[in-house]
Amino acid sequence: TVLAKRENKVVYKDGALAAKVFDECYPKSDILNEALNQARVEETGLNIPKIEEVTKIDGKWAIISTFIDGKTLAELMAEHPEKEDEYLNLFVDIQVKILSQKAPLLNKLKDKMKRKISETDLDATTRYELETRLNGMPNHTKVCHGDFNPSNIIIDESGTPYVIDWSHATQGNGSADAARTYLLFRLNHQEELAEKYMKLYCTKTDTARQYVDRWLPIVAASQSVK
């Protein structure tokens, strides 16, 4: 059964397992890095699907994990709009829990962003400004998901939330992760939800909105390249 189709990859259900199968053109190093990220986050004790195997299926690389039976938080939010605030509360609580973890072997967020900014088509002056701002931001070592949005949370039948898709995970500043989530809502034309999210995140983490805002151009630039 096909669970999801994304660019360059398909996720299949196979009994109690989920297989994420990558196209032949997908870099092997990226696939192995994703598996390694997931294994490292697994060790924090967070609720995530466990990696069972990295293998090849019909000549294509695949990551095999435990299958989580349930609905994504995005689906639940669409089905029960009256519960939006309750779901958003849960969403931010899960993010705060992730950010409270440490995984010292994960790649560093700032290094990844610096590399991404250097790969953009932005002119040298803009790149310099962004890199200077990035260098001036405080160094933290929080576990950052990197693509934290409601479609990457599965709520199982018992109501337990699981976080999936750790391909972008790094260790770094939680406000950069929040800025990324805010931008994902905006890109999805959910402006009202984006504002609600930002207020809730800042309240729950006692973070100044201006501080998260300082990350927005850096995050936007680093996300503009794959």
For each feature predicted by the language model, list its residue ranges.
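An alpha-helical support segment within catalytic cores of ATP-dependent transferases
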Residues: S100-G146, I154-E157, Y162
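Conserved short submotifs of the Hanks-type protein kinase catalytic core
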Residues: D58-T72
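Helix-rich C-terminal or lid/interface subdomains of diverse kinases
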Residues: R180-K226
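Activation of the activation-loop gatekeeper triad in protein kinase-fold domains
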Residues: D165-A169
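AlphaC helix of the protein kinase catalytic domain
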Residues: L73-E82
